Amino acid sequence: MNLIEMGQKLGLENLTPEVAVDDTRPVLYGYASDLLSDVLAHALHGGVLVTVQVHLNVVAVAAHAELAAVVFSSGRRPEEAVREKAVEEGIVLYATDQPAFDVVGRLYELGLRGTHA
């Protein structure tokens, strides 16, 4: 499954439509955390982060960890400066009103797997 398919299957709102998505690159891993040092230590490159954190550091961590996308759950939406930085870094941002637990469960059903700490 690629990012486009993931977004469609989960009904996610794409906050960064101007970021080009490589539809040939599969997304295999997910990570859920609001502790960004934990994300840096354990999230796998090319994976997807599910979080309620919406500040600028989330994009910096996603870029440093080479994540494919960030999903903001529980109705959280970042400010425009965060969205602009994600576009600059080439990070896809999604948003959903679904709680993080439900998002992670759906990603697991779709075949994504987590990272062992």
Describe each region flagged by the PLM.
Residues 25:
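Glycine/Thr-rich beta-alpha phosphate-binding loop at enzyme active sites
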Residues 22, 31-48, 52-117:
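Feature captures the catalytic cores and cofactor-binding loops of soluble hydro-lyases/lyases
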Residues 1-20:
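N-terminal, charge-rich interaction modules
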